[in-house]
């Protein structure tokens, strides 16, 4: 509203008052601000204006709409005044008379500074990053509301804070203890923690000049800064424990509700103590009450402990972001859902959702749902952290929180273009611990660091050194971390900006081990969350614990030094990036252990490459292996590392490996092992860890060379189009068992064709034949009637033997005595499909095999077998004959009496379901009779033919026939009553309901307990006919009501009650039910008459 309208209407009144005041000569009295009564000077200017004030206020002001206030009103006012050119003051004072803060910028001298740190042109002073260059903006711009405002005045520059013990000129001692004056452990521990903060201690020592000229103590008041400085000096100069009387005698002045001798909270005392020191520092300034909040936050305590949080509230409707800044001096971390300090920081700075429709958006102008997130806009020099261990009810959360002596808060800093690249590293300097179970009781101690870097425990007057491991395992309550000055990249730059005044976040450099050196420029790095060793699905870049996802350039020659090789291949090409959730891939990533010196765990995942489209993937362990050069391996080999032959050339085609294992290995890894490097087998191929599908996806080569890695063969080439598919080992066994009979019929013809088609002993389905035994001739294959040895499958649940349920075993085993026990057999090593180990694939009948050769069991993925060598069964298989007929027959039988029928692998009923019970018992006894004392079967094979029970030779006649009879009776008893079997299995027996029904609704009534108690009471057949002790019927009814499950314990055999009980017993013994006994008056009267 234009004020000139009202002024113009009252011009005459004001002019008359001025003339009268000047004429009388009392103008000075009218200009003074002293309060005078109306009767002293009625002719004063003040009295004239007050008298006409009512008239001025009652004057009607008419409003007019103008298009522009600047042109309509201000231009008219300018014509009535003379504009005098202002002169810039040379002392740098602003309009309020306060000294302007130039923040160390000499170019800003002589400028009037506004409220937000701007000059007259509206340009921020912080926009001059270089002191020697002043980039002027002719147009100027207003303050950015999304940036932290600048204070008009800085009471204590941030650059004057000295960080670290080395910044001081004096020699710092460990410090003496403090005497407990009576429940003052909270005070002693807090003071010790503050005195061992280098920044605060250096500032207190620098206040020596203030202590000499301090006039607060002379006036009878209290200066807490002087008291803290004197107490610190006493702990440094005194060898014995000191008494901090300067602090606890003035406890009422620090906090009004604190009482000496009463237990208090250490964090509460800390906050009141810091606030009292800030007030004492502000009292040094004459107009400290008129200072705004931003200026009050520039005290030395605010510069040391103070920081700013950036709060971003994002509207979920219009995505409007509201940014505010909040000053803090400590961070209160919630540890209820955290186990470490890093997790607590993650939860504090994570994005949280506000209450639904509880935030009024500035853009939508309505209440909407929003999210809120904190960021570090300006990190403090000393970070104070309080763990929320106490609740409002006084209970304490005593969980252990793990923390480190150094923490990095760079990822929580607010990102800005002018951010510094130096990391935000803090180191632990002191802490306060609490021993106790609640807030109302316990003991406080302190831990502080010294100039030498060691830590000491301060328990009141006791001071003792403590190891860093013990420090990290303490039950911390308050922790003080100080900014590490050694982590600054440039001391001059750190000094200029006050050690991260902007606290921005830039790219964090990744530490590379010294063993890797390359003259080429480093590839582009991925800035973001880093993966742990192993990564996704076993990917690892071999850089130790610091795993960074990197992107490879398209062409980069390889460089090798100290046994660590960098990748030089082209980047991985893929049309789509897929994370397969197959069981084999999950097991591979779960148990893949990282190895040292550049040896990584292998991951065999299929890669579908596309030349037209390029997609960058993280560097994996397979990509670091060169295809053209041999990687130099260290001489030391771990058990989980494959032994590579350094002298082999990977460019030459490899011949089949025919070196057998000298000693049978017993592995503790299941068959589907996550790592193929468990067995220490000398391998000549250094590129054996390449993916099996690399060559199949590329151009097909005519050579069919194969390389075996720890018993697993890998195909580098293929002759047919359909032979390159991987077949799972378990599916291969299942389908080979189903088609076993069909393969035996065409054995002779297909065997000859197989020898001609495979010159390099490489089968098209991925099975690789091994060295044959001497007893086998190439011209004459072994008899197809030789039963195969049971295949062993090792899984996570244990070892399983595969048995077949075909009817040809009984016929084929008749002439088994004429056959040689140890025959040559083709070792079939499957090429595992890591995308899906249980995926369906081609059966074994698709490829020509040698059906005359026996199938060798797949144990631990190893397919190595020599002549007359016992099988390594991992402790679960007896080293008997190769056919294993006894164990095979025992495993085919099911436990009928204990559980449901066990089906065979192909889903058919076992032999026990089809054969007579007598024949099974005979075969079982015959099998036990053929075993020697060591538990291994003899050379005489037990075949599966139908043997009459009379033709079996038993060790002892009476014992064997009794065993048959007992087994037959047991089987009849099992099939007789199904309910009894259910009782044997531990299930609850169902109560039979006969003539009587259970009609008792009493809670907790148990008919079984009542029946058992009845038998126990009358086990002697009843006692003598004792008379009734209680003749009162009403009392007897109450007694029976209280003792519901008790009967007449003293009635004779001839009493009616006893006869009634015996009848109930006979009824229950016959399987009938019963109801609860209802006492009647007629029965009791009859019993009393008989007595």
UniProtKB/Swiss-Prot annotation:
The keyword Protease applies. Belongs to the peptidase C19 family. The active site is at residues 185, 443. The lineage of its organism: Eukaryota, Metazoa, Ecdysozoa, Arthropoda, Hexapoda. Required for maintaining multiple types of adult stem cells, including male and female germline, epithelial follicle cell and intestinal stem cells. May function as a transcriptional repressor by continually deubiquiting histone H2B at the promoters of genes critical for cellular differentiation, thereby preventing histone H3 'Lys-4' trimethylation (H3K4). Controls selective autophagy activation by ubiquitinated proteins. It is an enzyme of class 3 (hydrolase). Residues 643-652, 691-702 have a biased composition (Basic and acidic residues). Coiled coil: none annotated. This is Ubiquitin carboxyl-terminal hydrolase 36. Residues 115-152, 523-572, 594-892, 972-1007, 1068-1091 are annotated as: Disordered. It comes from Drosophila ananassae. It is found in: Nucleus, Nucleolus.
């Amino acid at each position: 509203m234009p004020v000139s309208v009202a002024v113009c209407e009252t011009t005459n009144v004001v002019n008359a008052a001025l003339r009268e005041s000047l004429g009388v000569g009392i103008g000075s009295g009218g200009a003074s601000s002293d309060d005078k009564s109306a009767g002293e000077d009625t002719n004063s200017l003040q009295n004239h204006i007050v008298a006409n004030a009512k008239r001025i206020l009652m004057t009607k002001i008419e409003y007019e709409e103008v298009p522009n206030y600047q042109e309509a009103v201000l231009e008219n006012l300018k014509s009535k005044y003379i504009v005098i050119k202002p002169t810039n003051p040379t002392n740098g004072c602003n309009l309020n008379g306060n000294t302007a803060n130039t923040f160390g910028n000499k170019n800003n001298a002589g400028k009037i500074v506004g409220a937000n740190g701007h000059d007259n042109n509206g340009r921020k002073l912080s926009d001059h990053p270089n002191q020697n260059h002043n980039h002027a903006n002719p147009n100027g711009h207003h303050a950015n509301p999304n940036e932290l405002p600048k204070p008009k005045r800085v009471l204590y520059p941030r650059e004057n804070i000295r960080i670290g013990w080395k910044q001081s000129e004096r020699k710092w001692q460990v410090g003496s203890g403090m005497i407990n004056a009576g429940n003052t452990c909270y005070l002693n521990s807090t003071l010790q923690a503050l005195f061992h903060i280098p920044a605060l201690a250096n500032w207190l020592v620098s206040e020596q000049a203030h202590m000499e000229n301090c006039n607060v103590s002379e006036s009878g008041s209290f200066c807490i800064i002087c008291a803290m400085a004197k107490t610190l000096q006493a702990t440094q100069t005194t060898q014995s424990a000191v008494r901090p009387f300067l602090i606890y005698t003035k406890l009422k002045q620090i906090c009004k509700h604190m009482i000496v001798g009463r237990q208090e909270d250490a964090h509460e005392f800390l906050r009141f103590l810091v606030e009292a020191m800030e007030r004492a520092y502000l009292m040094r300034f004459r107009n400290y009450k008129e200072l705004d909040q931003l200026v009050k936050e520039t005290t030395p305590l605010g510069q040391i402990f103070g920081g700013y949080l950036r709060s971003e509230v994002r509207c979920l409707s219009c995505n409007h972001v509201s940014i505010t800044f909040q000053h803090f001096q400590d961070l209160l971390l919630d540890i209820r859902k955290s186990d470490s300090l890093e997790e607590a920081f993650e939860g504090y700075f994570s994005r949280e959702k506000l209450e639904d429709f509880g935030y009024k958006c500035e853009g939508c102008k309505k209440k909407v749902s929003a999210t809120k997130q904190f960021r570090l806009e300006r990190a403090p020099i000393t970070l104070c952290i309080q763990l929320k261990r106490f609740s409002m009810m006084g209970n304490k959360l005593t969980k252990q929180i793990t923390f480190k002596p150094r923490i990095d808060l760079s990822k929580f800093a607010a990102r800005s273009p002018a951010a510094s690249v130096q990391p935000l590293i803090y180191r632990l300097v002191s802490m306060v611990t609490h021993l106790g179970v609640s807030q109302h009781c316990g003991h406080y101690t302190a831990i502080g660091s010294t100039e030498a870097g060691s830590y000491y425990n301060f328990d009141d007057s006791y001071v003792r050194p403590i190891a860093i491991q013990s420090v990290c395992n303490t039950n911390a309550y308050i922790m003080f971390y100080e900014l590490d000055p050694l982590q600054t990249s440039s001391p001059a730059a750190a000094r200029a900006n006050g050690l991260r005044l902007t606290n921005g976040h830039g790219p964090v450099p990744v530490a590379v081990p010294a063993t890797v050196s390359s003259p080429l420029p480093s590839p582009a790095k991925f800035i973001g969350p880093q993966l742990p060793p192993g990564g996704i699905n076993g990917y690892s870049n071999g850089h130790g614990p610091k795993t960074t996802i990197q992107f490879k350039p398209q062409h980069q020659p390889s460089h090798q030094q100290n046994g660590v090789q960098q990748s030089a291949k082209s980047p991985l090409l893929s049309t789509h990036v897929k994370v397969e959730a197959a069981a084999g891939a999950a097991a591979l990533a779960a148990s893949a252990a990282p190895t040292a010196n550049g040896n990584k765990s292998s991951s065999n995942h299929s890669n579908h490459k596309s030349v037209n489209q390029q997609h960058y993937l993280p560097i994996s362990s397979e990509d670091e292996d060169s295809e053209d050069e041999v990687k130099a391996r260290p001489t030391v080999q771990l058990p989980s590392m494959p032994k590579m032959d350094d002298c082999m050339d990977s460019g030459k085609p490899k011949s089949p490996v025919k070196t057998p294992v000298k000693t049978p290995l017993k592995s503790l890894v299941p068959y589907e092992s996550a790592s193929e490097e468990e067995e220490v087998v000398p391998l000549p191929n250094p590129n054996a860890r390449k993916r099996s599908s690399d060559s199949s996806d590329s151009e097909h080569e005519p050579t069919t060379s194969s390389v075996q890695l720890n018993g697993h063969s890998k195909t580098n080439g293929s002759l047919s189009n359909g032979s390159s598919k991987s077949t799972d080992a378990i599916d291969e066994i299942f389908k080979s068992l189903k088609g076993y009979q069909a393969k035996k019929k065409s054995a002779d013809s297909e065997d000859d064709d197989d020898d001609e088609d495979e010159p390099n002993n490489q089968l098209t389905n991925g099975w690789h034949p091994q060295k044959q035994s001497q007893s086998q001739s190439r011209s004459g294959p072994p008899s197809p009637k030789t039963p195969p040895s049971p295949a062993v499958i090792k899984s996570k649940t244990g070892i399983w033997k595969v048995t077949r349920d075909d009817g040809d075993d009984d016929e084929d085993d008749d002439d088994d005595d004429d056959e040689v026990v140890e025959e040559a057999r083709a070792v079939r090593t499957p090429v595992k499909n890591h995308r899906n180990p249980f995926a369906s694939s081609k059966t074994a009948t698709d490829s020509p095999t040698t059906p005359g050769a026996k199938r060798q069991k797949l144990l631990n993925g190893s397919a190595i077998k020599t002549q007359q060598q016992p099988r390594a069964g991992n402790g679960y298989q007896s080293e008997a004959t190769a056919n294993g007929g006894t164990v095979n027959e025992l495993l085919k039988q099911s436990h009928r009496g204990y559980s449901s029928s066990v089906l065979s692998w192909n889903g058919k009923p076992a032999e026990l379901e089809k054969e007579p019970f007598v024949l099974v018992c005979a075969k079982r006894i015959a099998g036990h009779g053929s075993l020697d004392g060591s538990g291994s079967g003899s050379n005489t094979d037990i075949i599966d033919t139908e043997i009459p029970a009379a033709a079996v030779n038993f060790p002892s006649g009476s014992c064997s026939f009794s065993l048959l009879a007992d087994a037959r009776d047991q089987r009849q008893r099992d099939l007789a009553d199904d309910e009894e079997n259910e009782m044997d299995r531990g299930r609850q027996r169902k109560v039979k309901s006969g003539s009587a029904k259970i009609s008792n609704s009493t809670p907790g009534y148990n008919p079984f307990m009542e029946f058992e108690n009845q038998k126990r009471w009358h086990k002697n057949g009843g006692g003598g006919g004792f008379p009734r002790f209680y003749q009162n019927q009403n009392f007897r009814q109450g007694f029976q009501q209280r003792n519901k499950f008790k009967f007449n314990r003293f009635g004779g055999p001839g009493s009616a009650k006893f006869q009634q009980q015996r009848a109930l017993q006979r009824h229950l013994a016959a399987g009938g039910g019963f109801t609860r006994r209802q006492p009647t008056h007629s029965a009791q009267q009859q019993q009393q008459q008989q007595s």
